[in-house]
């Protein structure tokens, strides 16, 4: 397959706008098999958030799909047939291929708060009495998909200071005294007797949690006790373990334990299988709940999660502030299906990120930096900062996150800033490589590995960057570039690196041999990546279907057209080569009916992006 047209700027070469995901939570915070969103194509329009959506890292099981969504035809070989004669298997066992030819001041972090954050008291000053056990709340029916929690204390139009304030607004959930009075005691060993007519005092009943091994049944038909755990689902068992740990910690209110409980509640509130079978007390119900009962159960769980989160924020627990920021930005790190539990507010998201960053939360440093870099949530700051001031703040947050908090995402951003220059930031290629190396050593930054691969591939970088690298003694090293690409593609399932390996095996770049099976394999991995796949890999599969590969893949025009169409949808029509390919297919009737009007439309899209072949094709159609 031959490249068409003159070399064009590659939208993916300089991926400074692509950011690493939030760091993985500690293993103790992993919540069983909680379901997460999976988005298919076509790509949905998502409201811009304070930081870009990242590339998900998802294990591709079962095997890679070799058909486009709109067709039932498939490759002429199963995935199991992709075993290579050289003894390597790219499906996880492929070794590193062998080539053929051998600031400013940090004043925003130095000041300290002078008092407590002025959040709502929530009915008590105790850390134990209100949080000893989960509560049951009376609730009204709400849509299962939209249990919105409002914050009426501060409007989004109010101007705020970007620094940490002692009297900032409370989180979205704020309970009233009447709500507190409505709460029910968790459990008693037996129901309290009716008061006698003679008004003689009755000794109070002792309130206990269920003894280990008990299997009591309450009025709602729920049953608990460890003798019933054998019937629990794996997800419910994971919930029960967190619940049990939380109950044990109720008198201490240890932030780490309570934070895990809060995250668990937020996650499980949107797990329909769980909320239809279990309640907040980790008890399995005798029957599945009806939809309206599930709504009530969901609201109970959500309300309590915000009670715990509010309490943690009043204690100035940085992860809680960071979590609140992610909820306000509608980009939570938790697998929350409905992000509208909190009204989107970029200004308040930035405020919470800054609070958490000031307390050295590494993820908050990164997100605060991104917010300032792209001026998300900065319009309400007083005074309103200029673009240059925002860039300066962003660099400060990245620097703090990298140097103080050892955050690999911040190291990556510093590397990109020094390599390409962040607005007015001076380029320093050696310092960029230093930060990339540090991030790579932490083992959780695939973007860094990809950038290092590009640096040692050399020719894909802008000429001015190549000159700077050459002047500092950095030369092209194909073997080192392949090593970084291979590690990034295998260890992190990073779609760009997978596409790159497919491209190298297709055209024999970086000293690799032309191997059709390996090329198709890596393209397929990248095209099937979550959340929406890589559009360049989809276009490359279109090319393989158009030409075929002897003894590997039969030509299939329909599949060629479908993969090109999928690439266009995935890239939102912003990949010039894809738009040109669709114009060609419609003009020639490859895998579709001839449609010259559509052909012109696609050619025009590609031409507007500077694709020379499209300009020539338009002239040919009009003559």
UniProtKB/Swiss-Prot annotation:
Q: Which Gene3D superfamilies match?
A: Tetratricopeptide repeat domain (1.25.40.10)
- Give additional notes from the record: Present with 98 molecules/cell in log phase SD medium.
Does the keyword section mention Flavoprotein?
no
GO BP annotations of the record are: fungal-type cell wall organization; positive regulation of signal transduction
Q: Where is this region: Disordered?
A: 141-230
Q: Which domain of life is it from?
A: Eukaryota
Q: Where is the composition biased (Basic and acidic residues)?
A: 176-193
InterPro entries per record: Chitin_Synth_Reg (IPR051726), Sel1-like (IPR006597), TPR-like_helical_dom_sf (IPR011990)
Repeat is among the record's keywords: yes
GO CC annotation, single: mitochondrion
Cross-link type Glycyl lysine isopeptide (Lys-Gly) (interchain with G-Cter in ubiquitin), placed at 184, 191
Leader peptide range in chain numbering? none
Q: Which UniProt keywords apply?
A: Isopeptide bond, Repeat, Ubl conjugation
Spell out the residue ranges that the record assigns to Sel1-like repeats: 318-361, 408-444, 495-531, 576-611
Q: What segments bear the compositional bias annotation Polar residues?
A: 152-161, 206-215
| Protein's name according to its UniProt entry | Activator of C kinase protein 1
Native organism is: Saccharomyces cerevisiae (strain ATCC 204508 / S288c)
